[in-house]
Design a protein with these regions (language model features):
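Domain-level signal for soluble alpha/beta catalytic cores
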Residues: 1-368
Length: 368
C-alpha cells in the first residue's frame, strides 16, 4: 500500500491520548470533591487546562490532538459507567498491577443503553479548540466483559450472552454516530485485553473462570467490528493495546506471539497502536502476521519512565520492526498514555513534552 503522512491518520508521529494533569486541575478536582467548588467553576478550569494542553501538543509537533482526557478520572470507567446498565464493582481475584493495586471490575445489572452521547461534549470542545486533527479515545467494548466475565453479568437481564454483546455494541454504535455527526474522523478504541492475553498467567485465569483465551480474542474482535460497523468510511479507527498503565506500573508480561495471528486476522480496524517499550512486550516477529493494508504504530517511547530515549535507538528499533512489515506501514508513538488515570505516571510534564517532541523529530528524520 501507499501511505501518505500528511493528511490521514494515524500519523507518522502520533500519541495515545492521555496526558499528565496540571496542578491547577488536580487542585480544582480536590476542591470540587470537597464541595468547595461548583461544577461550572470546575468546567471553566477544565476548559482552560485543555486549551493550554492543546497548544502544547501542537507546539511539540503532534498532528493528532487530544484533550488529554482531562475531564476524566479514568481512561475507561468514566465512559463505560456512563452507559446505562454498567457500574463499577469490587475487584475479583484476578490481574493486579505489579505494585499491588487491584483493579475494579464492571458489573451489568440492567439492559445496556446509551443515554445520549456520553462524551459528546468532550469532543465538541476539543474540535472547537484545535486547528489540527482532533483525536478522540474511548475504551473498547471488551472492557465491559473482560475483568469480571460472565459471572458479573446478571443472568436474569442477559440469559443469552449474545444479547449482552448486541446491546453493548449498539450503545457504541450510538456513541460513534454522535461523535461522527459532531465531526470526529479519528477515533481510537483503547483495549488492554489483547495484550493481557499475551500473559500465560492471565490466560490461565481466563481458563479457570470458564473462558477460552483464544476464543476471547475472536469475541473481542467481533465486538469491535460490530461497534464500528456503521462508522462513515472517512472515519479512521485504531485500536491501542497495552499491558496496564497506572502510576508507572503494569499488569501483564509476554510477547504478542500468543495472540498475533488470531488478533490480526480477526480485528478489522485501520491501525494498531502496539507497545514495545520494554522486553515485556517481546520482539517484533509477530508483525509478520500484520495485514499489509494496515498501519502499525510502534509504541517505543516509554510513558512510565522519565529517561529520554535517543533518536539512534528509536531508529534502530524501527529498522528492526521493518524486517517484518514494510517501513511504509509503520508510525511512531509513546507506548501508552502519560496518565491513563488522573493521578498519572511517575514523570514530570517537562519529561512528557520532551518525549512527544522526540517522537515528532524522530518521525521527521525517518519518514520525512
Amino acid at each position: 500500500m501507499t501511505y501518505q503522512n500528511s493528511s490521514k491518520p494515524p500519523f507518522r508521529a502520533d500519541h495515545v491520548g492521555s496526558l499528565l494533569r496540571p496542578t491547577l486541575l488536580h487542585e480544582a478536582r480536590e476542591k470540587f470533591a470537597l464541595g468547595d467548588m461548583t461544577s461550572n467553576d470546575l468546567r471553566q478550569i477544565e476548559d482552560k487546562c485543555i486549551s493550554e494542553v492543546i497548544k502544547k501538543q501542537e507546539a511539540a509537533g503532534m498532528k493528532a490532538i487530544t484533550d488529554g482526557e482531562f475531564r476524566r478520572a479514568s481512561w475507561h470507567y468514566d465512559f463505560l459507567c456512563s452507559l446505562e446498565g454498567i457500574e463499577q464493582t469490587a475487584p475479583p481475584q484476578g490481574p493486579a498491577f505489579k505494585m499491588g493495586h487491584q483493579i475494579n471490575s464492571l458489573s451489568i445489572s440492567s439492559k445496556i443503553t446509551n443515554p445520549g452521547g456520553v462524551m459528546l461534549d468532550h469532543f465538541r470542545f476539543l474540535k472547537e479548540t484545535t486547528k489540527a486533527t482532533p483525536k478522540f479515545c474511548i475504551p473498547a467494548p471488551s472492557l465491559a466483559y473482560h475483568r469480571g466475565g460472565r459471572d458479573l453479568i446478571d443472568g436474569t437481564v442477559y440469559p443469552d450472552i449474545e444479547e449482552f454483546w448486541f446491546d453493548l455494541c449498539a450503545a457504541y454504535q450510538d456513541e460513534i454516530a454522535y461523535l461522527s455527526d459532531a465531526g470526529c474522523d479519528y477515533l481510537q478504541l483503547d483495549d488492554t485485553t489483547f495484550a493481557m492475553l499475551c500473559d500465560p498467567k492471565i490466560r490461565d485465569q481466563m481458563t479457570e473462570r470458564g473462558d477460552d483465551p483464544n476464543q476471547l480474542i475472536k469475541t473481542y474482535a467481533k465486538g469491535i467490528a460490530n461497534a464500528v460497523s456503521a462508522k462513515p468510511t472517512d472515519m479512521t479507527v485504531t485500536v491501542h493495546m497495552c499491558r496496564g498503565n497506572f502510576k508507572s506500573s503494569w499488569i501483564a508480561e509476554g510477547g504478542y506471539e500468543a495472540v498475533a495471528e488470531n488478533m490480526f486476522s480477526n480485528l478489522s480496524v485501520d491501525g494498531f497502536f502496539m507497545e514495545w517499550d520494554t522486553d515485556r512486550a517481546g520482539g517484533f516477529e509477530p508483525l509478520r502476521y500484520a495485514p499489509r493494508d494496515k498501519i502499525i504504530v510502534l509504541g517505543l517511547v516509554s510513558t512510565k519512565l522519565p529517561h529520554l530515549e535517543t533518536k539512534d535507538d528509536l531508529k534502530r528499533r524501527i529498522d528492526d520492526a521493518a524486517k517484518y512489515i514494510p517501513l511504509e506501514n509503520l508510525c511512531l508513538s509513546p507506548q501508552c498514555g502519560f496518565a491513563s488515570m488522573a493521578v498519572g505516571n511517575n514523570l514530570s510534564e517537562d519529561d512528557q513534552w520532551r518525549k512527544l517532541a522526540l517522537v515528532a523529530e524522530t518521525s521527521e528524520e525517518v519518514w520525512g
